[in-house]
Amino acid sequence: MSQTLIQQDPEIAEAIRLETERQEYNLEFIASENFVSEQVMEAQGSIMTNKYAEGYPAKRYYGGCEMVDIAERLAIERAKELFGAEHANVQAHSGSQANMAVYFAACKPGDTVLGMNLAHGGHLTHGSPVNFSGKLFNIVSYGVQKETGYIDYEEVERLALEHKPTLLVVGASAYPRTIDFPAFRKIADKVGAKIMVDMAHIAGLVAAGVHPSPVPYAEFVTTTTHKTLRGPRGGMILCREEFAKTIDSNIFPGIQGGPLMHVIAAKAVSFKEALAPEFKEYSTQVVKNAKVLADALVKRGLNLVSGGTDNHLILVDFTGTETTGKMAEKALEKAGITVNKNSVPFETRSPFVTSGIRLGTPATTTRGLKEAEMERVADWVVRALDNMENDTELAAIKGEVREMCKRFPLYAHLLK
């Protein structure tokens, strides 16, 4: 145990070094990614990784849990304070598992669930046929209006009245506009449905008060703890007190065994960070940056789903052109800008090709980039898309990107 990682496992040590270098010298615009603080990393890499703790604080199936109970209680109380929730379960290993637990708490297999179409901005766990949600439940999907790119609330109401879902799933993984939670509540009440809001993408914005909160309008709210919340990779469920026992039992022993106590400790650290005034400033800047970047891309001739953004996310639509999302993603990666190919509403191409790319500003805002840098990024994006076959030009952009990254360091000291 006295050896360093580079001595004991040089291959993994080198992979970590190269990944640190990639994050340090490229601009991360994948909307679901962010950079955690070194304090979050310290907690996640702590000795708490050694401890098994099946159960919940003060009700464990193992001894020696006094200290991990402290960490989990802190995570729970901070999460409740952050979102104004009556109950929080912080044990979910991921957003998908948080969603699964809510499905099992609210529905029986075969029940009807109304959720957002994946191609229109939803998530795999909102009813995709390749996912457990699509296999175990009768899924009805709603989408966005073709003309506007906004959620079609009239369609949601029509489908709800027609199919009488047990659960109405709200939230998205690629929807750039503010979601009208009161409108969904009214629709759900007309048919006696419960609501699960998956706020994984916007949780940090909600915590900071720069996006409306779903908590007052939904029986269940799920989220990841990374993305805009800027914590470790993991999941969480918020719910009303009346559903606390069924949610907890559907996480453990329902779908999980032992919780990841080192991750829960890191969640607690990130929640404390999100309660600080600086986090509101950060989240406000995330949205400012996204709006400036969206406007700059439109001015430079790109088409955006819904024409812009209200949150952290931008969806570029190449429909009607020869450019595909796959081509754009590869070209931008060569230019030092990381994005992901993404299906767009009314998609005609394969999910492996797509007609769009998704960009988000949480990670670059964490670096310290602001409006002026977003204008520069828009220039680079358009230059890269105009020169997708020109490796020399893409390499030139990458060099310029690297210089900007040096001005806004992340973990540069870890490379010394």
UniProtKB/Swiss-Prot annotation:
Q: Which residues bind (6S)-5,6,7,8-tetrahydrofolate?
A: L118, G122, H123, L124, E242, S350, P351, F352
| Catalytic function, reaction form | (6R)-5,10-methylene-5,6,7,8-tetrahydrofolate + glycine + H2O = (6S)-5,6,7,8-tetrahydrofolate + L-serine
Biological process terms from the Gene Ontology for this record are: glycine biosynthetic process from serine; tetrahydrofolate interconversion
Pfam hit, one: SHMT
GO CC aspect terms: cytosol
User: Which family does the entry's similarity section mention?
Assistant: Belongs to the SHMT family.
- What is the name listed in the Swiss-Prot or TrEMBL entry for this protein? Serine hydroxymethyltransferase
Q: Corresponding gene?
A: glyA
